[in-house]
């Protein structure tokens, strides 16, 4: 049957309205799950609770945030500098901003997806999510997801298990940008991109994805 579900990973007002229209007109041929831009469009998720379940192949799945950029563009936030550089990439948000965004998602009982490529971004997400869970005594984390998780360290993977965080790996990345990763990160770090075996050893639930339209959706290049 091929690909039967797709995800829109950053819904805005205009995109939400478009997908709703497609659903109402019964134009969607496969299931579409939308994750709302939490920072700017929280109202979409809060005001449309009826869309939490499928209606003509469309539903809302939760929220999405971005914590850094990409390793090939040297904007992924790293703990150590890129090769032959003093630059480490940069964070999108401060720790306190991330703490507040996570708190908002859990307050709305919503799953939160966070774009994290660099090890510093992964550390920030895990640390702040754990802090929110502890400070507010939340019982359910609603299965938060670390999207890409390309350079997440084993230390963070271990800390993800108690909060039921799921790494979703972009494993096809090395096929397309492996030479750039070697140049930007060096052999030691580049060889650890998408540490699926570490996730398995840690006992984590994990998934694979492709970042269409960054890549054409060809699942065989992922598995």
For each of these PLM feature ranges, what is it?
Residues 12-123, 127, 159-166, 171-172, ...:
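Metal-coordinating catalytic core of metallo-dependent amide/deamination hydrolases
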Residues 103-112, 120-144, 148-149, 154-162, ...:
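His/Asp/Glu-enriched, well-ordered alpha-helical/loop segment
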Residues 4-5:
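Short acidic/polar active-site loop segments enriched in Thr and Asp
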């Amino acid at each position: 049957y091929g690909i039967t579900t797709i995800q829109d990973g950053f819904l805005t007002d205009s995109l939400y309205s478009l997908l709703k229209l497609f659903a109402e007109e019964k134009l969607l041929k496969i299931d579409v799950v939308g994750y709302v831009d939490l920072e700017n469009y929280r109202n979409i998720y809060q005001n449309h609770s009826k869309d939490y379940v499928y209606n003509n192949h469309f539903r809302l799945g939760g929220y999405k945030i971005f914590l850094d950029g990409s390793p090939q563009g040297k904007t992924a936030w790293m703990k150590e500098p890129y090769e032959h550089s003093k630059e480490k990439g940069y964070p999108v948000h401060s720790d306190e901003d991330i703490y507040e965004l996570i708190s908002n998602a859990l307050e709305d009982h919503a799953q939160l997806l966070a774009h994290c490529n660099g090890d510093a971004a992964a550390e920030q997400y895990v640390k702040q999510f754990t802090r929110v869970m502890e400070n507010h005594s939340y019982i359910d984390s609603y299965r938060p997801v670390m999207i890409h998780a390309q350079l997440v360290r084993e230390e963070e993977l271990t800390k993800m298990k108690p909060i039921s965080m799921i790494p979703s790996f972009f494993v096809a990345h090395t096929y397309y940008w492996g030479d750039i990763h070697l140049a930007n990160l060096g052999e030691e770090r580049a060889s650890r991109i998408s540490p699926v075996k570490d996730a398995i050893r840690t006992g984590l639930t994990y998934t694979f994805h492709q970042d269409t339209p960054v890549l054409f959706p060809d699942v065989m290049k992922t598995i």
